[in-house]
Amino acid sequence: MLVSYNWVKEFFQDFPLTAEELGEAITRTGIEIEGVEELSASLKNVVVGEVLSCERHPDAEKLNKCLVQTDEEEPVQIICGAPNVAAGQKVIVAKVGARLPGGLKIKRAKLRGEVSEGMICSLAELGFESKVVPKAYADGIYVLPEHVETGVSAITLLGLDDAILDMAITPNRADALSMNGVAHEVGAIIHQKPAQPTEPDVSEKGKADDFISVEVENPTETPYYAIKMVENIEIKESPLWLQTKLMKAGIRPHNNVVDVTNYINLLYGQPLHSFDYDKIGSKKIVVRSAKDQEEITTLDGEKRILQTGHTVITNGTEPIAIAGVMGGEFSEVTETTTTVALEGAIFSSSSVGKASRELYLRTEASIRYDKGSDAWKVEKALAHGGALIAELSGGTLVGGVVEVDNREKAVNKIETSLTRINRILGTEISLSEIETIFDRLGFVLEVKEDTLIIEVPTRRWDITIEADILEEVARIYGYDEIPVTLPATSTTGGLSDSQKARRVMRAYLEGAGLNQALTYSLTSKKDATRLALSDEKTVALSMPMSEEHSHLRTSIVPQLIRSASYNIARKNMDVALYEMGTVFYATEGDNLPIEQEHLAGLITGNWHTADWQKTPKPVDFFVLKGIVEGLVNKLGIEAELHWKQIEKEELHPGRTASIQLEGKEIGYLGALHPAVEASYDLKETYVFEINVKALLDATKEKVVYHPIPRYPEMTRDLALLVDKDTDHATISQVIKEHGGNLLVDIELFDIFEGESLGENKKSLAYTLTFLDSERTLVEEDVQKATNKVVEALQAKLHAIIR
């Protein structure tokens, strides 16, 4: 947010800080100031001039020869190329010797044989961005009001003797998205109460009820909606003070009605919207949910397709505005407007945020509604806006408002204690200092023995728990005043077994070719339930920053999918990621959620890229399966993993398996469903997710060192014909159980399916390796062990030896 230093000073009688000092002070209290720009730093010798005469340059069609009176005794001749320059205008003149932004210095010059002693300036030449210059002056010079005195400083007149503070407002401090909010923050810093904005004293006539009525169908989405009427208005340019305030805040002036709504938004942080009353086409406004595929053409001339869940303002039949986002072209205020219906409302942040994101339409209004606003300042903002429109347009302010009010006001009181504040902050703040801090913040403090009861004003809706109060105390007391303390301990530092295991896991996965990812624990309601290991309920935030970050995740995989999609959209086609992080499950009542540490991974694209030696190898199920099995081996886990084919929503039904260890399911591994891959523009993609605690709790095998075998091993190949639904894990287990002590390895080297084998049959071929560390094996030993294996396979699995 761009904040005018001079505007801040208007809230206080005696302001003690320079712009630079103010920026530093605000940063120290927790709101970052990204920069302070002195607008007049590169401006000098710029005054108001009056164009006495204007005629075409004799040798150039696009140049004008102007005689201009400035603060000098005699008028000067200036050659000007602006298409809108004319005699009788009050203009901005950079005199000879003047300095302008970009290092430009004005000199006496000759243009096509005619002397030019200065320059008539556009706003862009004074440093204003082109996007904030009024459209009427976008391609020419800026024409000042006729009443402006000739010869005075244009720098002062345009408010350029000012500094702009660029404030980086975090989502939790949306109260500072207004000048009133900034003034309260500054007041707490300099220990002064800011003056409250006052509306013009304009008499009212008539009743708003005679003009319009209001109906709200969903009070949850629209707790408050009101209309203020102003009639007999004249649409014209806003006064210079209003235009300059808007331009310095990065907003383009339009006319005296639209500019007032933008000004009130800046002043109070409360969006207003103006309708041309005569274009509404009805004497009734209905606020309702949009119908699916309903259409509206917005003020930017774009046709928008609405969805269920968007809130719209209608004339009872068709939409005239998207609530909290943008008005409709249908009811736009234009030069012919004579009566304005001024809207002031509170819309739910979720509804506005949803519409803004889905329509790709982010406005100053939607930003404030999405981040939250003070529900109890809307009447003040609406009254001020209506009175100011009446004053600037010469209109008649209609008495009263038409409103629907479903707000519920609750006093926000939070308890803490002086002892607790000092213990947590590590300070020795006295009670009198605490009282001063809350007085500076504008909070009401009640002391009952050692208990402090703090009543928080509605303008600070971000403060809801004790920790917020402690943060406010720390901010105003001064982070740099809090003493640095170190914990006293005599315990020698070291890594726990679980910390060592986690390091081993990370090192192994990175060695296997995966890159570590770090994603948000916050996600959308939709993603919160996707691909979870457990069916437990999700955890919703009470005050989410947005709908996209409204729930705590129950699985890491959806975030990795988004990360892969982001990379592939930027032509990074081979992606291999892993993340070790926390997932959350809801508990009954107000108990804290269950937290579990999970490990998740994703691979897509080619596992081996092509070079002069080999062709590229795409990722597949067995690549990721091998990585997971290698991880278990690296951790020294005694039990083997077992894989069981399962079906899981959003995963491929034929390429998904549960991961089982010591008889418990600890995770899953599989390919994404083709529909999911298509929705994220992914090619074949494989994912896994494992409960880390289950891995770390598994029995670790003791490391036993054996000498390298002195005797040779012997192998036997077995080809089995079995039912199609008999899996490799089952066959391998039977072989292990009956192979005896001499069997040291089993390797599956071939799988074949075909009509020649018979219906629902498949052939699997294994190599069995036998070894005796004490002596050389003889044929009889190996044959005896092999026969036992064959008999067991025939008896238990009805296998046919081929």
Swiss-Prot record:
Indicate where this protein is primarily found: cytoplasm
Top-rank taxon, per record: Bacteria
Q: Which SMART domains match?
A: B3_4, B5, FDX-ACB
Instruction: State where the protein is found.
Output: Cytoplasm
GO biological process terms, semicolon-separated: phenylalanyl-tRNA aminoacylation
Enzyme Commission code = 6.1.1.20
Q: Where is the tRNA-binding domain?
A: 40-155
**Gene Ontology molecular function, alphabetical:** ATP binding; catalytic activity, acting on a protein; magnesium ion binding; phenylalanine-tRNA ligase activity; transferase activity; tRNA binding
Give the record's GO CC terms: phenylalanine-tRNA ligase complex
The record's section on PROSITE patterns has: B5, FDX_ACB, TRBD
Which residues are Mg(2+)-binding?
462, 468, 471-472
Describe cofactor binding as the record notes it.
Binds 2 magnesium ions per tetramer.
Residues in domain FDX-ACB?
Answer: 709-802
Q: Please list the residue ranges annotated as the B5 domain.
A: 409-484
Record's catalysed reaction(s)? tRNA(Phe) + L-phenylalanine + ATP = L-phenylalanyl-tRNA(Phe) + AMP + diphosphate + H(+)
Which cofactor does this sequence's record say it needs?
Mg(2+)
Q: Share what the entry says about its subunit structure, partners included.
A: Tetramer of two alpha and two beta subunits.
Query: What is stated as this protein's family in its record?
Result: Belongs to the phenylalanyl-tRNA synthetase beta subunit family. Type 1 subfamily.
Name the record gives this protein: Phenylalanine--tRNA ligase beta subunit
Q: Which organism is it from?
A: Listeria innocua serovar 6a (strain ATCC BAA-680 / CLIP 11262)
